[in-house]
């Protein structure tokens, strides 16, 4: 007979700064019994990956109680900056991770200037 355990986060996402146009990955690991599901939250709203093809979830079961989730943002843009956290949820309860802040640096366009000396 297995015991039921409320979710607990084992790995929280970390603060990151990424240059616009590059990919960024946020990680979250949780455990519980039954195994929790993980959802991602941005600025206190659930992320809807269906409306943004640049955002992907990768979920991996580590064993019968632990799950690892990656939130991958491809081609990061200014609008991706914000506060992110994950929420682990099962039939016993839910647990939110500590937040991580994602900053996007926009280096702008690069111009080459040539000087010709005569």
Predicted ranges, named:
Residues 1-118:
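Immunoglobulin-superfamily
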């Amino acid at each position: 007979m297995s015991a039921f355990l409320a979710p607990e986060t084992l790995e929280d996402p970390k603060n990151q700064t990424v240059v616009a146009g590059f990919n960024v990955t946020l990680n979250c690991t949780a455990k519980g019994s039954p195994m929790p599901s993980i959802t991602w939250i941005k600025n206190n709203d659930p992320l809807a990956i269906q409306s943004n093809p640049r955002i992907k979830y990768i979920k991996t079961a580590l064993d019968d109680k632990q799950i690892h989730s990656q939130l991958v943002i491809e081609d990061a843009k200014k609008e991706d900056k914000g506060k992110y956290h994950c929420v682990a949820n099962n039939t016993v309860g839910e647990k939110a991770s500590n937040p991580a802040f994602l900053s996007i640096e926009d280096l702008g366009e690069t111009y080459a200037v040539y000087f010709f000396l005569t």
